[in-house]
């Protein structure tokens, strides 16, 4: 039914299972939750699959805003729509995204930014439109996460935070494009604009870091250094284009010195993909004088201030931050999905585990122990 129809039928409250975080760092609990109808300009989605991102893990370990339903990398099918929604209808396949695109604010109409002023990253655990929740347990509110909350069989998102996708695209694969893989590719392509023959160093070889490597490889980078403390990442990283692996725990001298020696004076581009402000400084020290660019993608759990000597900038280096790799979700994700469907980019290789939704705590353990890239959780059919 079209939202413009005079016979618009208001959806009702439904109940479903959701993995709820009650206490920081403790196992999620499968609970029956009430999911309110979508309000104006919102849609309710039947989640088909969702993947665990390190941001979920970090927030779960430190988050005081509880109870909460985490999850923000997700794909599903529109179950119902709120008033005023014209872009979607019941049955559409969609990706949910943590940063939206209203299409009319200063940033959305600019070609320079994807930082929507209306539907930017939501940090209060509420919906953008009315600062309320759509989840409850026995009448008591349950907080959202990044305005997505995909660790639930059903969720409600603003229509500006959803992207309609080709129904032929496999949802259990492309769900990774709603955060990590897209963020890494975009950092290499949109933010750094890595050039053919350049040298790149990546700090942190999780899904985001390896996506940066894939993007750099596809751009023709000649040297891609990967820095991590997990030796198991060395062989895995080659698949995505890393030419040299550096275990920072094995070094007897400062990392920047090693990288400058390996690159002949410093990398053209460095990427901080851990979420550690100290590593951001190290990344800045590791890139070349004159033109070296450091791009930060990680979200720090603590100490958000970056400390760097002013001389690093006087020498011509630059530091840039990015959220979601600079992609405007509605405008750009469909073409990224096309690249996957045409086998121009890799997604499957990031999926190390496929688990049922009730195995969600196993996914958290695997990520906490560094034994996975992406665990895709499949909802009951």
From Swiss-Prot:
Metal-binding listed as a keyword: yes
Cofactor(s) in the UniProt record: Zn(2+)
UniProt binding sites for an alcohol: 55, 72
Domain of life: Eukaryota
Positions bound to NAD(+): 55, 204-209, 228, 233, 297-299, 324, 374
UniProt cross-references to InterPro entries, sorted A to Z: ADH-like_C, ADH-like_N, ADH_Zn_CS, GroES-like_sf, NAD(P)-bd_dom_sf, PKS_ER
Ligand binding (Zn(2+) 2): 102, 105, 108, 116
Catalytic activity: a primary alcohol + NAD(+) = an aldehyde + NADH + H(+); a secondary alcohol + NAD(+) = a ketone + NADH + H(+)
Subcellular location: Cytoplasm
Cellular component GO terms, alphabetical: cytoplasm
Gene3D superfamilies assigned: Medium-chain alcohol dehydrogenases, catalytic domain, NAD(P)-binding Rossmann-like Domain
Pfam families: ADH_N (PF08240), ADH_zinc_N (PF00107)
GO terms, molecular function: alcohol dehydrogenase (NAD+) activity; zinc ion binding
Coiled-coil blocks: none
Stated family: Belongs to the zinc-containing alcohol dehydrogenase family. Class-III subfamily.
Subunit note: Homodimer.
Protein name, UniProt field: Alcohol dehydrogenase-like 6
